[in-house]
């Protein structure tokens, strides 16, 4: 919720934004979300809590392995979020993340979209690790 995100900001934390498709899916669009939809989500959170409190939260494997069991588990664990998405888009594990950001190897697609929207190199550096490092260093003395 917005309140939870504001609490993260108030406590100096960082929120990782996931490309998990059911979270960023725009129902009216009727199709699997893409990189632009993901960056729309990033924009919303950055506008709410500020660039210093946002990071990428890829939530997928580095090697691109598909997790069909995890996909099935999601439908059971989060029926309100996943049910409508599955009905419209499908249940294949390769449809679980935004098109063009299926894994960390495609982070460049996200960075390119952010540059198109006017994010600076420093903003992108914060989102790709600088913010997380700041919080980890502050807490892992």
Task: Please name every model-derived segment.
Residues 30, 65-72, 136-141:
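Short glycine/threonine-rich loop-to-helix capping motif typified by GTGT followed
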Residues 92-141:
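Mid-to-C-terminal alpha-helical segments outside catalytic/metal-binding sites
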Residues 24-40:
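Active-site glycine- and acidic-residue-rich loops that bind
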Residues 15, 59, 124:
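Conserved, mostly hydrophobic/aromatic
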Residues 23, 61, 129:
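Positions that flank functional sites
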Residues 18-19, 49-74, 78-100:
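Short acidic/histidine-rich active-site segments
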Residues 1-13, 36-53:
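Histidine/acidic residue-rich metal-binding segments in metalloenzymes
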Residues 14-28, 65:
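Active-site clefts of carbohydrate-active enzymes
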